[in-house]
Amino acid sequence: MQAPEAAEAASQVNQSIEQVLGDPAQYEPAIRAFQSAVAAHDAAAVARMVEYPFAATLDGKQTQIKDAAAFAAAYDRIVTPEIAQVIAKQNYAELAVSGKGVMFGNGEAWINGICRDNACKQVDVRVVAIQAGAAN
């Protein structure tokens, strides 16, 4: 993609985020920080971005991860090399947006806003799912 086309596509993603989820100014920095942390294999940083409890499949079993320390300890079983590659290489302009959040790849990771008050005026953008994608 040429630069103007990439900028237009990123703008379209931001417009979709705004229409479906809320302020894209909250989402874009969270998405980029998540990608950077995964690319750097920074388990502690990724763990700080996750919403808890976090459902993960470990050793073929659904598991509830209660906190960042437990997530970081299980990081390599949650964020496999294949999943990490999808997250790190995801082009912002090609993200999919739905009511479930912002999707990386074929669903390998999802980020969404978590309401912190009844009116949903306070929102934290968090990682809500990391899993094998639909194509896997």
Task: Indicate residue ranges for each PLM-predicted region.
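C-terminal-biased regions
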Residues: P4-S36, A47-N136
